[in-house]
Amino acid sequence: MDQFKHIDVKGAQALIEQNEARLVDIRDPQSFAVAHSETAYHLTNDTMVSFMDEVEFEQPILVMCYHGISSQGAAQYLVNQGFEEVYSVDGGFEASYRAELPVIAG
């Protein structure tokens, strides 16, 4: 895969519920602490190495940010690191929240 793909929040949730994909949230620590998707891994510069050590490169990765813009750059970065199936979640956390998908509030 040379390029990431786009996926909507419902499609992302379906992959998560099937235990097929790993969701990463790239928002800032304060926003993540206030609320984040139930299964989200907080991916930062500091957690990148541990994430790459524990995840299979063949496993689909869903990248979520605030509104689906920043996630595109992060998704492409993960593709460049060798992840085979990477998606940018369109609409980001905001769309996930509006769709009333499972959220943990801090």
From Swiss-Prot:
GO terms for cellular component: cytoplasm. Its EC number is 2.8.1.1. SMART domains: RHOD. The keyword Phosphoprotein does not apply. The active site is at C65 (cysteine persulfide intermediate). It catalyses: thiosulfate + hydrogen cyanide = thiocyanate + sulfite + 2 H(+); thiosulfate + [thioredoxin]-dithiol = [thioredoxin]-disulfide + hydrogen sulfide + sulfite + 2 H(+). It is an enzyme of class 2 (transferase). Residues 17-105 form the Rhodanese domain. It is found in: Cytoplasm. It comes from the Bacteria. Keywords: Cytoplasm, Transferase. GO terms for molecular function: thiosulfate-cyanide sulfurtransferase activity. InterPro entries: GlpE_sulfurtransferase, Rhodanese-like_dom, Rhodanese-like_dom_sf, Thiosulf_sulfurTrfase. Its main location: cytoplasm. One of its GO terms (biological process) is glycerol metabolic process. PANTHER family: FAD-DEPENDENT OXIDOREDUCTASE, THIOSULFATE SULFURTRANSFERASE GLPE. Transferase that catalyzes the transfer of sulfur from thiosulfate to thiophilic acceptors such as cyanide or dithiols. May function in a CysM-independent thiosulfate assimilation pathway by catalyzing the conversion of thiosulfate to sulfite, which can then be used for L-cysteine biosynthesis. NCBIfam families: PRK00162.1. Belongs to the GlpE family. This is Thiosulfate sulfurtransferase GlpE. The lineage of its organism: Bacteria, Pseudomonadati, Pseudomonadota, Gammaproteobacteria, Vibrionales.
